[in-house]
Amino acid sequence: MEYHPTLALAGHMDHPTYLILDIDPPEGGPFSVVVRAALLVREALTGAGLAGAVKTSGAKGVHVFVPVAAQTTSEEAAAVTRAIAVRAERLDPALATTAFIKEDREGKVFLDSTRAGGATVVAAYSPRARPGVPVSFPVPWGELDRVTPADFTVHTAPRLLAGGAPWAGQLPAPQPLSPDLVEEGRAIPIARVQAMHEGKRRARARRTDTGS
């Protein structure tokens, strides 16, 4: 059974406990490019005065979790997530992209900044309903380039957890978000909304071309 909790506590749904970057490889891409993109996100976070922890998604990518202060609103967290994603993209635009429409990604690693608001994300240690039953598992930053998602399954996780659960120790303390960083993110279009409008525009253009 998979477990996908929300990012906020019950009764405080407008105040998320984390902001999250979901990093996925291009179709058929190796995990090594995900690692490189995750390190871009870490660099962008450091530049913004923030810190995060990373875990495999249990699929092909990773999730970077950034604990945020209790007073943070969903809108503020979403804005900062967009800002960090765009900053990471700018560090290596040949590797990473924030393009929500798959055909626009050009074989690059996708930095998904839409895990905000009422979104859910698979929990650390949750198994996934996939061949081999992989598990979403925390990895120290310094070891990320030495693992693959296939290293963490329902068969290997119990042994890896024998010395204790590492996720809580890897997560930094909750952090306040800079007002300047929030404003930076507010100026960036929401990816899902932008993609929806662009999809409609392209559909209209195709209909026009077909009719001409």
Residue ranges and their predicted role:
Residues 32-36, 44-47:
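A conserved hydrophobic secondary-structure block that centers on an alpha-helix together
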Residues 65-77:
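Catalytic palm subdomain of template-directed nucleic-acid polymerases
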